[in-house]
Amino acid sequence: MSKRASSKYKIDRRMGENIWGRPKSPVNRREYGPGQHGQRRKGKLSDFGVQLRAKQKLKGYYGDLREKQFRATYDEANRRKGDTSENLIGLLESRLDAIVYRAKFVPTVFAARQFVNHGHVSVNGVKVNIGSYRCKAGDVIEVRQKSKQLAIVLEATQLAERDVPDYIEVDHNKMVATFVRVPTLSDVPYAVIMEPQLVVEFYSR
């Protein structure tokens, strides 16, 4: 397991929230952050602090994206017509690794990135090994034949803690998903409140 993958629980502790809604999250048992200073009482955040926290939470949710990559996604959302915050969510949910996670092909978004990177997924019949690959409405995402019996896949499809959202159609018998449409914020089944408008405010300072 990579260091970035093993850090997933640290993200929960850092945020003080169970951001993926997982039963084993350590924040279900403790109310302070990671590290030796985690138990210190937290003061009231400034406006900047609130905006930064919203950004860090959204970055963390999608696999602790690197700042350069997340900023590039925001910049594209800002260039597009319409509401920048909604555009940002749509772009993040259009990532191949996000769709693999939403389709319940794997148990976590970290596993989804590794699964894609290791060549286990195809889009419209072509192998794609880039987690940030942007899917379009109508794209068909499939677990490649040689990977369909992997234990991680079989276990993930049985997870009861989350459902497949209605903007993705899935056949778990064939391990095929269709990205029906780009979702809006209200469509996305976040386990906690996400505030992309605060992310827009952060980058607009």
From Swiss-Prot:
Region (Disordered): 1-46
SUPFAM superfamilies: Alpha-L RNA-binding motif (SSF55174)
CDD domains in UniProt: S4 (cd00165)
GO MF term (any one): rRNA binding
Ranges for domain S4 RNA-binding: 94-154
Matching InterPro entries: Ribosomal_uS4 (IPR022801), Ribosomal_uS4_bac-type (IPR005709), Ribosomal_uS4_CS (IPR018079), Ribosomal_uS4_N (IPR001912), S4_RNA-bd (IPR002942), S4_RNA-bd_sf (IPR036986)
UniProt keyword list: Ribonucleoprotein, Ribosomal protein, RNA-binding, rRNA-binding
Domain of life: Bacteria
Cellular component aspect of the GO annotation: small ribosomal subunit
One of the protein's GO biological processes: ribosomal small subunit biogenesis
Function: One of the primary rRNA binding proteins, it binds directly to 16S rRNA where it nucleates assembly of the body of the 30S subunit.
PANTHER family in the cross-refs: 30S 40S RIBOSOMAL PROTEIN (PTHR11831), SMALL RIBOSOMAL SUBUNIT PROTEIN US4M (PTHR11831:SF4)
Subunit structure: Part of the 30S ribosomal subunit. Contacts protein S5. The interaction surface between S4 and S5 is involved in control of translational fidelity.
Stated family: Belongs to the universal ribosomal protein uS4 family.
Protein name (database record): Small ribosomal subunit protein uS4
Organism whose genome encodes this protein: Allorhizobium ampelinum (strain ATCC BAA-846 / DSM 112012 / S4)
